[in-house]
């Protein structure tokens, strides 16, 4: 069982006053959605080029922890392209120099590609970047037709050239004085979340099956009186495994929110939409924002099954806990 060899002692995750999660990159953008309680939508002043956000196939979220008067932003993932990430951060008025840390969910290009060149625009300083050591591997998806989708990994030298302090870790990591938890490898315990069977990675001996994508990791925040907020890039470990692993790591059973990709799109994963949704209903997740690779069918099933918890994610949306 992947992850079972890692120590899973309860982690001392400091509770915070609140957290704001801003969707910086996602597959979907809609500037006409209305605010709802705890959810603020981006409002464009006009349809000129200056203040328009862009969507792309990728994910990035700004996770801003609130403790007293202090606001501490962490960038989780960087989307696919520098053009989209840089533009959206500018439009959303996010000062790059205010970032406290960066976390990469896994080594697929649609989660790290946007970081290229980003920090050359800001004053030179060292910024920690947490990444799993398997994220450097070259990957690809092989379709039933024989077509291949290459997934270029990040390059350590390029990240360090940006002024980033690369922190490789398989296990969990605490950031911001114990207020943000990076999960590290996710323990796989469900019977139905079996990985990505057409996913491959290059090793010294050539290409080999890599269905488990062991570098998949998420960030977890514990909000006082509300519970855990989990932000997950693709949930290649399985969204239910991600949820249960967060509970196991922290000892907290209340889930205030789950934001990010469920990777339930396509014929391989659609058969597990049902048990995934059932598990989230049973967990009584407070808010759910199924983004990026969740897939049209899964999004609609989640919306129907959890109407009070469901929030349609979109680039520029800020959800507060």
Residues of each region from the PLM?
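Beta-strand-turn-beta hairpins that frame and shape the catalytic cleft
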Residues: 16-19, 67-73, 174-182, 222-229, ...
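Short acidic, glycine/serine/threonine-rich loops at helix termini
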Residues: 35, 140-144, 270, 302
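Metallo-beta-lactamase
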Residues: 134-217, 281, 311-320
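Active-site metal-binding loops of divalent metal-dependent hydrolases
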Residues: 25-27, 78-80, 107, 134-135, ...
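Cap/insert and terminal regions of metallo-dependent hydrolase folds
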Residues: 108-112, 128, 206-315
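N-terminal amphipathic/basic leader segments beginning at the initiator methionine
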Residues: 1-41, 173-183
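Conserved beta-strand hairpin/beta-sheet module of binuclear metal-dependent hydrolase folds
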Residues: 26-30, 35-92, 212, 216-231
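Active-site metal-binding motif and surrounding structural segment of the metallo-beta-lactamase
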Residues: 83-131, 250-257
């Amino acid at each position: 069982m992947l992850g079972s060899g890692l120590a899973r002692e309860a982690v001392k995750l400091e509770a915070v006053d609140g957290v704001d999660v801003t969707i910086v990159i996602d597959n979907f953008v809609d500037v006409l959605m209305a605010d709802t309680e705890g959810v603020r939508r981006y409002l464009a002043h006009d349809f000129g080029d200056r203040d328009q956000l862009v969507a792309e196939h990728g994910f990035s979220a700004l996770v801003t922890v609130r403790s007293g008067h202090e606001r501490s932003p962490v960038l989780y993932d960087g989307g696919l392209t520098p053009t989209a990430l840089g533009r959206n951060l500018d439009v959303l008025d996010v000062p790059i120099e205010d970032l406290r840390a960066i976390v990469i969910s896994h080594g697929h290009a649609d989660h790290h590609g946007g970081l290229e060149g980003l920090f050359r625009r800001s004053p030179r300083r060292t910024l920690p970047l947490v990444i799993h050591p398997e994220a450097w591997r070259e990957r690809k998806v092989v379709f039933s037709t024989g077509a291949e989708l290459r997934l270029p990994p990040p390059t350590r030298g390029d990240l360090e050239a940006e002024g980033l302090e690369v922190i490789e870790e398989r296990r969990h990591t605490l950031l911001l004085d114990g207020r943000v938890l990076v999960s590290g490898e996710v323990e796989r315990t469900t019977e139905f979340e079996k990985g990505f069977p057409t996913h491959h990675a290059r090793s010294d001996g050539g290409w080999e099956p890599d269905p488990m994508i062991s570098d998949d990791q998420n960030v977890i925040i514990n909000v006082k009186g509300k519970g855990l907020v989990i932000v997950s890039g693709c949930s290649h470990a399985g969204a239910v495994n991600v949820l249960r692993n967060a509970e196991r790591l922290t000892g907290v059973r209340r889930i205030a929110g789950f934001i990010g990709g469920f990777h339930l799109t396509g014929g391989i994963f659609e058969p597990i939409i049902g048990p995934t949704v059932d598990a989230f209903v049973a967990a009584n997740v407070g808010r759910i924002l199924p983004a990026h690779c969740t897939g049209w069918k899964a999004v609609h099933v989640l919306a129907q099954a959890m109407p009070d918890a469901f929030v349609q994610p979109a680039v520029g949306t800020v959800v507060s806990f």
